[in-house]
Amino acid sequence: MTPADVEAMIKKIADGQSEKLNWQQSIVDLMKLLKLDSSFTARKQLAQELGYKGSLDGSAEMNIWLHKEVMTKLAESGGVVPESLKHA
């Protein structure tokens, strides 16, 4: 699945929600749409599990990196949320 396919799939999910989320830029909103725990603790744990090497302080850098990684993992798994993202 291409990144464009993933974006189209997520947009379709977002369009069906009453709450308007900024999933294109916000890892918290993206995780909410995917029904993943978007808490700070969960994001820190997921960043560690995915190999983030920077500070785990919830910085914009960490969140941007994590957003990119989640989108990549979705593309690699054919648009299905992989188990590795669910348990964080």
PLM-predicted stretches and their roles:
Residues 1-88:
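Amphipathic alpha-helical interaction segments
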